[in-house]
Amino acid sequence: VMEDAAEAMGSTYKGRQCGTFGEFGALSFNGNKMITTSGGGALICRTEEEAKRTMFFATQARENRPYYYHEHIGYNYRMSNICAGIGRGQMEVVDEHIARRRAIHSLYTEHLNGYKGISVKQNPSEEFDSNFWLTCIEVDPAQCNGKSADDIRLYLETQNVESRLLWRPMHMQ
């Protein structure tokens, strides 16, 4: 099982880090994530052997010889040294980034509490500890004088508050 934990860096379930539940886990370092390398990500492996095998294929499956020789088809999934250096530097502040996102989520929860038809999504139970990479707000137009999520998004735009509608389920696209 490959666990897609692209947006979950720092989130836990039952005290366990997201990205560690599958045989492999994948994190994203895209520009809008907890840390960035301007793109790319990380593959979480359970064993050193799996990590070495993954790196072998991710670096063109080149055999250890004094010339280019390949017995397998490989790929070029290497991150540049500059981008990796940026990522290593950001690892030093990842906890601060997560704390900031959680604080922002708390502010939205506090300030939107009491508005009929607007709810800020929380952890589904005490077993979860989200990084709150995004603060998600659900709008019930029936309780918001007929205002839809898009109506609210457009209003926020006039106030210079960035927002967007989240992803639609694949079966609804």
Where do the model's predicted regions map?
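Active-site acidic short loop of glycosyltransferases
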Residues: 15, 22-23, 114
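Active-site PLP attachment segment
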Residues: 20-58, 81-84
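Catalytic PLP-binding core of fold-type I/II PLP enzymes
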Residues: 1-15, 47
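PLP-dependent aminotransferase class I/II
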Residues: 12, 48-173
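Short clusters of hydrophobic/aromatic residues that line enzyme substrate/ligand-binding pockets
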Residues: 9, 18, 35, 75, ...
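Hydrophobic faces of well-ordered beta-strands that scaffold small-molecule active sites
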Residues: 1-3, 25, 163
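Hydrophobic packing within well-folded, soluble alpha/beta domains
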Residues: 1-2, 29, 41, 101
